[in-house]
Curated annotation (Swiss-Prot):
Protein name (record): Adapter protein MecA
Annotated transmembrane regions: none
InterPro entries named in the record: MecA_C_sf, Neg-reg_MecA
One term of GO molecular function: protein-macromolecule adaptor activity
Coiled-coil positions: none
Functional note: Enables the recognition and targeting of unfolded and aggregated proteins to the ClpC protease or to other proteins involved in proteolysis.
């Protein structure tokens, strides 16, 4: 485990999957308010050398963000003299087994306002490069450059009518790896952006993968820039791997 102080009131604790396993924890344990989760946080706090201003500081709130190979826990202190508040993790009732609905509820509660904003590097670099091409190149040169960029990367926006369809999509693509993925909600519709790296693949790879995606998803009627501006982002990176790795009941 590693700890980094972000500000006077916020710590970031990075917990590897090996750390979780050693403590008998799973990713889904963070999605419900239960005694096991509370005990784990007390244990982590005992094991780490907390800054002095976090010791006996009153109420602490926790926000959990799953990553591809770890869990990031953001610890925020307040001046209220109360016990640890674990309600920030979720407001769901106890359940037996993780259902898609419960997982989605936890995502909406915990992730859409998270403060650890890390750019979705590959997609952002792709968009930035295309923008620079637009602004600096003549039309013939621009066409050649854009074609070269698209040969290396392509991205798709997929739509899902409900969260069950998202789960089916992730389960149906268990063995598929992508360069990047984001997960959004807009109204009652869910969206996922998928970035594919094409440089080492045959010419037909992109079309084959898109056809495979559409076996489980729908063609989106929104672009990624539109979703970035208007939709709620539930996972801003590694959305597909996280959903693939989750065990559904």
């Amino acid at each position: 485990m590693e700890m980094k102080q972000i500000s006077e009131t916020t710590l970031k604790i990075m917990i590897t999957m090996e750390d979780l396993e050693e403590h008998g924890m799973e990713l889904k344990d963070f999605l419900i308010p239960q005694e096991k989760t509370e005990e784990f946080f007390y244990t982590v706090m005992d094991e780490l050398d907390l800054p002095d201003n976090f010791k006996n500081s009153g109420m602490l709130s926790f926000r959990v963000t799953p990553r591809k190979d770890r869990v990031d826990v953001f610890v925020t202190k307040s001046d209220l003299k109360e016990d640890l508040d674990f309600n920030d993790l979720s407001d769901m009732e106890d359940y037996s087994g993780l259902s898609p609905e419960e997982f989605l509820k936890a995502l909406e509660d915990n992730f859409m306002d998270k403060g650890d904003i890390e750019a979705h590097h590959k997609l952002e670099e792709h968009d930035k490069t295309l923008k620079e091409v637009d602004e600096t190149m003549t039309e013939p040169a621009k066409e050649v450059a854009e074609e070269t960029i698209r040969e290396d990367y392509t991205h798709y926006v997929l739509a899902f009518s409900d969260f069950d369809q998202v789960v089916t999509f992730a389960q149906g693509l268990k063995n598929v790896s992508v360069e990047g993925s984001e997960f959004y909600k807009l109204g009652d519709v869910y969206y996922m952006t998928i970035l594919l790296y094409l440089a080492d693949e045959p010419d037909y790879y992109a079309n084959n993968m898109y056809a495979r995606f559409l076996e489980y998803a729908n063609v989106a009627d929104r672009t990624r820039p539109y979703l970035q501006e208007h939709a709620t982002i539930l996972m801003e990176e590694d959305a597909l791997p996280v959903l693939q790795a989750t065990k559904w009941s």
